[in-house]
Amino acid sequence: RFKPGDDASCNNLYRSTQPRVIGLTESFVKHFDAATVAKFRWMKTEAKNDADKVNPWHLLDSTDRADDDSIPVVIDMNTAMYSLKPAANVGTNLELTYDDRVVRFHVVGLLENSVLQGSLLISEANFERLFPEVSGYRYFLIQSPPGKSKQVAEALESRLSDQGFDAVPASQLLEQLFAVQNT
């Protein structure tokens, strides 16, 4: 799921007050339980048990703060430090306004630079609760077989052109982010 908002990546020179939000599916989270898959790199998390240390994405489902209605969120470190207003760190609560409604997020993890830079990452269940008017899926991470990325992208763009599908290689997206970040 995808809620449009400010680009909070390093491509935006201004501080973001309403960053885009991505709701991560349960299958995305469980994918990283496997020891053999490539994983995102984490700068810092609130992980306390072994399962959450192995796969910090499970922190998005945490309910440890029963007295608090905040939504667990993961953000990349650069967005958290430089693009959000106010800046955030693990353990920080952020209050942001979406659709004239204040939403409180609790930062449970900070990612290193990744293709997810500039977005607030929450569980799909929390996304559906916060933004019930947003239906369908608009943001995809696709793992293609080695050497087949171009063919997979062409097939998806061809078959989903009426829906406006546009595949961008992760390497290209990261190059764009690093070009700005390293200036």
Go through each PLM region and give its residues:
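Alpha-helical transmembrane segments of bacterial inner-membrane membrane proteins
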Residues: 1-183
